Amino acid sequence: MISTFALFWALCIVCIINMARYYSSLRVLLLVLRDCDPLLYQYVDGGGFFTSHGQPSKQIRLVGYIYAQRYLDHHDPEFIRRCERVRGQFLLTTALCGLIVISLIAMMIWY
């Protein structure tokens, strides 16, 4: 039988790997955004997005832009493809983090 703790840690590792993939895809999306739509790049603070002085309100704007699928009207197909990829990875990572929290609560109750 598979250990519950081993399964939990495997789930955590998968979640961390997906977070790294999401982070990498978001960086590439910002590079594509800088070339195809400089105004939107400035609107979401693309240059300072991953810095310590980045503005969270502008970062949330980009997340909202992608989550609401407002990118579908964009003129660049590469940008649309990158946004769809980032959106899928965001939803997957969110679901995995939720599953980890639920399994952690279940393990606390069970043991």
From Swiss-Prot:
* Transmembrane feature ranges: 1-21, 90-110
Q: Where is the signal peptide?
A: none
* Broad class of the protein's primary localization: membrane
Question: Could you name the domain of life of the organism this protein comes from?
Answer: Bacteria
Which subcellular locations apply to this protein? Answer: Cell inner membrane
**Is-annotated flag, keyword NADP?**
no
GO CC, sorted alphabetically, is: plasma membrane
Q: According to its record, how does it sit in the membrane? A: Multi-pass membrane protein
UniProt keywords (A-Z) are: Cell inner membrane, Cell membrane, Membrane, Transmembrane, Transmembrane helix
Family designation:
Belongs to the universal stress protein B family.
Q: What is this protein called?
A: Universal stress protein B
Recorded source organism is: Pectobacterium carotovorum subsp. carotovorum (strain PC1)
Q: What are the top taxonomic ranks of the organism? A: Bacteria, Pseudomonadati, Pseudomonadota, Gammaproteobacteria, Enterobacterales
The primary gene name is uspB
